[in-house]
């Protein structure tokens, strides 16, 4: 059975392919009487929309969302919320050459091995085009969090590294993230990164990146031992983003080099934490501190450099990908990371309420 859904109480199912007529999602479990309209969703989709700079794919999709069900007179009804975006700028002819050839680094060969058939147009179901609906679902999750927790909830992500060039954390400025096309929080890194990406594009190649996402203003108590840990679900959500190859929570792999007294987050009355190496989660349960996740995303597999591969019949070939592609998919993964964080937190908020109520 395929797995096209995630979440338990706030459950999101996505559907559609890159070059199909439309993509969409169904959100089940959203509480009734939340104020919701397309205007609450569209701005988040606009942040992810392709073709907004020379550093992302030049596929031009307006990504106009339509609410098909679950909302009446501007409020959620408690029934499934169905959202849809029409695809308008497909160029399927660009992919005719790979109908029988496997693109190295893509899911082509894996899909064929599993299903014996694949939609080769733009990657079909495995395309990052699907993530537009995750962003749409994340917008609904934000409305839920804002309504049930408060306006103080903030979920923000940023690009923290490209091709081994990383930001200076001491210059982190969230306002700067919205001022440049790379979602970079360090103004001094933007110029060198743009020069690097221009060089990569000119070479017909691609490059990897790192993204960090932070959620603030959430209550303590989200997550449950031992198989419903908040950090486990966050790691799974981030790992499910196209191209992600590694996920960290808090200081992640860096803690392997620390001593116990260095890694411990001292606690004072309040409670107040002196540091946040744990990323806001202990024992799988949120502590009320900022929740921090980080991931590494691989270079875009679609490149102009010929790479050895095989056909469906096992013959040796070289594949040079045509079409419109991102030189660094990490850039447009930033709003997707925010959306996945929002969906997981909305799900865990409802799960916590179901078990513990609101009175804690």
Curated annotation (Swiss-Prot):
Highest taxon above the source species: Bacteria
SUPFAM superfamilies for the chain: Chorismate synthase, AroC
Listed GO biological process terms: amino acid biosynthetic process; aromatic amino acid family biosynthetic process; chorismate biosynthetic process
E.C. code: 4.2.3.5
Record note on cofactor: Reduced FMN (FMNH(2)).
Signal peptide positions on this chain: none
Catalytic reaction(s) noted: 5-O-(1-carboxyvinyl)-3-phosphoshikimate = chorismate + phosphate
Binding site for NADP(+): 48, 54
InterPro entries, A to Z: Chorismate_synth, Chorismate_synth_AroC_sf, Chorismate_synthase_CS
CC annotations in GO: cytosol
UniProt pathway annotation: Metabolic intermediate biosynthesis; chorismate biosynthesis; chorismate from D-erythrose 4-phosphate and phosphoenolpyruvate: step 7/7
Residues binding FMN, per UniProt: 125-127, 242-243, 283, 298-302, 324
Protein role: This reaction introduces a second double bond into the aromatic ring system.
Subunit structure: Homotetramer.
NCBIfam families listed in its UniProt record: aroC, PRK05382.1
UniProt protein name: Chorismate synthase
Originating gene: aroC
């Amino acid at each position: 059975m395929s797995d096209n859904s995630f979440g338990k109480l706030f459950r999101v199912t996505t559907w559609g392919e890159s070059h199909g007529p439309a993509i969409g999602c169904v959100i089940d479990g959203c509480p009734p009487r939340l104020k919701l309209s397309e205007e609450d969703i569209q701005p988040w989709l606009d942040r992810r929309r392709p073709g907004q700079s020379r550093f992302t794919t030049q596929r031009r999709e307006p990504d106009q969302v339509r609410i098909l069900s679950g909302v009446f007179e501007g409020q959620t009804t408690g029934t499934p919320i169905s959202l849809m975006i029409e695809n308008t700028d497909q160029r399927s002819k660009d992919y005719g050459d790979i109908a029988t050839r496997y693109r190295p680094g893509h899911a082509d060969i894996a899909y064929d091995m599993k299903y014996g058939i694949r939609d080769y147009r733009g990657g079909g179901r495995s395309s990052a085009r699907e993530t537009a609906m995750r962003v749409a679902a994340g917008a609904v999750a934000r409305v839920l969090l804002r309504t049930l927790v408060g306006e103080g909830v903030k979920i923000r992500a940023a690009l923290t590294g490209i091709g081994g060039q990383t930001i200076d954390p001491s210059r982190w400025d969230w306002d700067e993230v919205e001022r440049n096309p790379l979602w970079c929080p360090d103004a001094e890194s933007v110029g060198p990164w743009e020069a690097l990406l221009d060089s990569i594009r000119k070479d017909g190649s691609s490059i990897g990146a790192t993204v960090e996402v932070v959620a603030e203003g959430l209550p303590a108590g989200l997550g449950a031992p031992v198989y419903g840990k908040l950090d486990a679900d966050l790691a799974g959500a981030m790992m499910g983003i196209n191209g992600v190859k590694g996920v960290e929570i808090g200081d992640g792999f860096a803690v392997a080099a620390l001593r116990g007294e260095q890694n411990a987050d001292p606690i004072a009355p309040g409670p107040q934490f002196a540091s946040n190496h744990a990323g806001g989660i202990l024992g799988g349960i949120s502590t009320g501190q900022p929740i921090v996740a980080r991931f590494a995303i691989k270079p875009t597999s679609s490149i102009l450099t010929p790479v050895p591969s095989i056909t469906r019949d096992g013959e040796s070939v070289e594949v040079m990908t045509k079409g419109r592609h991102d030189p660094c998919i990490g850039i447009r993964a930033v709003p997707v990371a925010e959306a996945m964080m929002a969906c997981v937190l909305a799900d865990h908020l409802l799960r916590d309420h179901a078990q513990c109520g609101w009175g804690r």
